[in-house]
């Protein structure tokens, strides 16, 4: 699909007209694990579905287009995407990253550092990242916004500085999606997502994606993914394509809802701080009395107390015991992820119901 089209058009028409044999408008679901060769020495382009599958290939085509990238690979989960991205870097690489990041990423970073595979340096602010880039760095890895403190970073500035030092730049774009941010355009070498979240958008798909503009990186990534086999299944590829079609509409609605909810939270006597970037559906906030958090979570009727984010349903998460439980308390507290923080993923419900639910739980 042409990247010259506007992103809303690319999304709405994701995967259409891909079946030349029948003219089917919707991308077919190809379950076959193997493909017949027309003749000896000939291939249709598909041989074994771990290597390449028609449905997955169509999903990857759309994912590359919306991220302004030339290449995309769909993986079996967001963590599989992170592991795949790091598979192209030599053992012993020095990685500079942010302290505030997804707990699963921290858990894996911590494990591979113990094994001696990579060495990590953590920074709390953009200024600290810039200062650390004066040192020997092989990889700059950032989330922006970060999870869950919602810190934003200037990708273009950091990429320019990193590249001047010969470092590669990897960006996790899960929170914003390509609707609000396309890091490839700002100089990132690799961009990844937990496609489970906003891209698929319905809490029924486990998926990841890695995109790049570099043929050299793509060939390494493709080889490693084919070898390890953590590919996205045909069915999940089909579901992902379907979810992508409404991405821009969902992001627009969740952002509109989030802005109204932020306005409410900022006036609530039960809330002492709200963390929101002004766009997207992710909000974090700190309560006045953290002892009331169990009551708040148990009192909600419209919000679901659950991990994950980016679906059409609104969720509330307590990072201390859920997404960031593997990060030691003293580490979390040192950079501001304290036990009084709750995270919201705002869905597409009527915002009046969402605000009413929060009000009765926070102030009741």
Regions found by a protein language model. Give the residues of each.
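N-terminal "arm"/small-domain region of PLP-dependent enzymes with the aminotransferase-like
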Residues: 1-53, 61-62
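Conserved PLP-enzyme active-site core in the AAT-like
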Residues: 2, 11-13, 72-270, 275
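Positively charged, small/polar-rich N-terminal and surface patches that mediate targeting and assembly
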Residues: 2-8, 230, 263, 310-311, ...
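Conserved N-terminal alpha-helix of the aminotransferase class I/II PLP-enzyme fold
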Residues: 34-83, 87-88, 104-111
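PLP-dependent enzyme catalytic core of the Aspartate aminotransferase-like
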Residues: 119-121, 250, 318-364
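Short, well-ordered beta-strand elements within core beta-sheets of diverse protein domains
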Residues: 242-249, 281-288, 343-347
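Conserved small-domain helix->loop->beta segment predominantly found in fold-type I
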Residues: 259-313, 327-329, 333, 359
């Amino acid at each position: 699909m042409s990247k010259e089209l506007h992103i809303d058009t690319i999304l709405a028409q994701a995967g259409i007209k891909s079946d030349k044999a029948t003219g089917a408008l919707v991308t077919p679901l190809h379950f076959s694990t193997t493909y017949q060769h027309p003749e000896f020495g000939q291939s249709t382009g598909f041989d074994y579905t771990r290597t390449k599958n028609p449905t997955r290939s169509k999903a990857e085509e759309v994912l590359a287009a919306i991220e302004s990238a030339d290449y995309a690979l769909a993986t079996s989960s967001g963590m599989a995407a992170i592991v795949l991205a790091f598979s192209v870097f030599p053992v012993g690489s020095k990685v500079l990253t942010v302290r505030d990041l997804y707990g699963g990423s921290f858990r894996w970073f911590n494990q591979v550092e113990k094994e001696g595979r990579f060495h990590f340096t953590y920074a709390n602010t953009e200024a600290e990242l810039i200062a650390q880039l004066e040192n020997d760095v092989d990889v700059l890895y950032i989330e922006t916004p970060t999870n869950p403190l919602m810190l934003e970073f200037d990708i273009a500035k950091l990429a320019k500085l990193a590249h001047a030092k010969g470092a590669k730049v990897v960006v996790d774009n899960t929170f914003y999606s390509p609707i609000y941010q396309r890091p490839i355009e700002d100089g990132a070498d690799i961009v990844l997502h937990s496609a489970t979240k906003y891209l698929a958008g319905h809490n029924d798909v486990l998926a990841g994606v890695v995109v790049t503009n570099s043929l050299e990186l793509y060939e390494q990534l493709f080889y490693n993914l084919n070898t390890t086999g953590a590919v996205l299944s045909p069915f999940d590829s089909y579901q992902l394509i379907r979810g992508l079609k409404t991405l821009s509409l969902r992001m627009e609605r969740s952002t509109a809802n989030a802005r109204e909810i932020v306005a409410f939270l900022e006036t609530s006597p039960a809330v002492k701080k709200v963390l929101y970037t002004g766009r997207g559906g992710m909000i974090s906030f700190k309560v006045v009395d953290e002892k009331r958090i169990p009551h708040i979570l148990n009192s909600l009727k419209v919000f679901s107390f659950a991990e994950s984010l980016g679906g059409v349903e609104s969720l509330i998460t307590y990072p201390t015991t859920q997404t960031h439980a593997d990060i030691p308390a003293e580490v979390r507290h040192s950079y501001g992820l304290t036990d009084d923080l709750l995270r919201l993923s705002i869905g597409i419900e009527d915002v009046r119901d969402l605000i009413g639910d929060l009000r009765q739980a926070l102030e009741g």
